[in-house]
């Protein structure tokens, strides 16, 4: 399944300069299956019993993961904006008073994880669709680990789920989705630009932005406010 979304990365320079460059990011997701079982005697039955629930969780993880990448990209890498930000534009300051405030890649990954931890619940809907069919389902808390690479974002989610029906009980806990995204490439370019800005705080290297964008096949737009 292919989807396209637009991710826009914003950079605020000093008190009055806002540099924005927009990136079109293709998003394509696929879920990686996890093995499920309860006991040697019931492993086939339990696995078949849990398949629809497992597929449902993975579908929600895929959808929420795509939404996370778009939302984070449109808000400068943040799920929750830091104090040093522009409230009206809902964007963080990356460069302020000659100091770089660009978040680290680890912090970016944490922001994505926080999005999944808080938003996956809404897609799952407390498994109401299954409970109405007679399933007895209990779920624990969501805990996500995110890894951003050059062309991919991988979400690994721990979500304890117990599925019961009749005499069969099945447990699930591990789910993962890899989403094709150039978020890592975008971040690397922003980091390169911030390093340039720290070395030359009195000016903006417009030529650098253009050249680096072309080399990475990224479309850039710049605005001054």
Could you describe each region identified by the protein language model?
Residues 1-4:
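N-terminal leader/signal peptides at the extreme start of proteins
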Residues 10-225:
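Long, compositionally biased, intrinsically disordered regions
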């Amino acid at each position: 399944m292919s989807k396209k979304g637009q991710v826009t990365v914003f950079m605020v320079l000093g008190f009055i300069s806002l540099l924005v460059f927009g990136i079109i990011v293709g998003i394509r997701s696929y879920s990686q299956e996890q093995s499920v079982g309860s006991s040697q005697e019931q492993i086939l039955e339990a696995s078949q019993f849990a398949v629809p629930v497992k597929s449902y969780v993975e579908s929600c993880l895929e959808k929420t993961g795509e939404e996370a990448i778009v939302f984070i990209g449109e808000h400068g890498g943040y799920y929750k904006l830091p104090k040093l930000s522009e409230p009206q534009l809902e964007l963080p300051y990356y460069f302020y008073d000659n100091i770089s405030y660009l978040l680290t890649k680890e912090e970016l990954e944490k922001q994505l994880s926080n999005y999944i931890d808080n938003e996956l619940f809404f897609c799952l809907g407390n498994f109401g669709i299954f409970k109405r069919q007679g399933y007895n389902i209990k779920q624990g808390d969501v805990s996500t680990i995110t890894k951003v690479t050059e062309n991919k974002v991988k979400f690994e989610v721990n979500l304890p789920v117990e599925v019961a029906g009749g005499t069969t009980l099945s447990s699930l806990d591990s789910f993962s989705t890899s989403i094709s995204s150039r978020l890592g490439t975008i971040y690397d370019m922003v980091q390169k630009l911030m390093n340039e800005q720290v070395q030359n705080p009195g000016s903006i290297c417009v030529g650098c932005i253009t050249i680096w964008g072309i080399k990475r096949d990224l479309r850039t737009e710049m605005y001054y406010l």
